[in-house]
Amino acid sequence: KRLFKYKIHSFRRSLRLMRKNILKKKFKEGTPIINGWLQIPNSFSAEVMAQQGWDSLTIDMQHGVIDYPNALQMLQAISTTETVPLARVNWNEPGQIMKILDAGCYGIICPMVSNRKEAEKFVQACLYPPKGYRSFGPIRGLIYGGQDYGSHANDEILKLAMIETSEALKNLDEIMSTPNLDGIYIGPADLSLAIGQKPGFDNPKGSKTHTEILNILKHAKKHKLFAGIHNASPEYAQEMINLGFNFVTVGSDQRHMSSEAKSVIEKMKGSKKGQDIKGY
């Protein structure tokens, strides 16, 4: 058996078959995906996070302090593990989407998708023709993904559109019926602002934001899409899983570091001596 497995492994290596996106496998199996969030522009901190066992890690290029050279090194660090590398781009801009995919990113979270046209623009930027208009040049994607990357990338790349604007709430079915869209991702802070509420995470039951979250989830389930959401705490993330979300982000590298440092200071100097946790 060992010899057979070795031969199969050697055969796959010789062919360089494209690395599978295990997030899609988990979705089909009904297994919740626990996603980490990176805002610090450092490959070592990304490697430390990746070693903790997250199913995926998202490099935040929208609100994190991360540019492309940072992101490339962080992708290299994440690839030392089985954690799936994702990125949230700073806007629905094809050039940036294609470039970070070329660097070996296995999925894109796109902010502020408000209608069908914007959803199609986003999805098609992630796909090679004839399904999309992505330009071919996966300079690191070939190294990380495999030599047959071009033949299978359309099937493996994860595409999540963020639902967080008042216009998007009016166009949920149009957005979610976009061909080849894999799922949606809720940004609770911007969603709260869009409906006249204070921005924040872990919105309580009965709040306007929580009601809208349930409505978005219902539509995602109807269209059989990934349903993702950003959370501040593991307890709230578990509540979201119990409701039916299958992709949950819990905090961020910056927030985890702040929280642990605050805890240490409070224990050493007395309660409430640490700074309130900032960021998300």
List the predicted regions and their residue ranges.
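Short, Lys/Arg-enriched N-terminal segments with co-localized hydrophobic residues
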Residues: 1-17
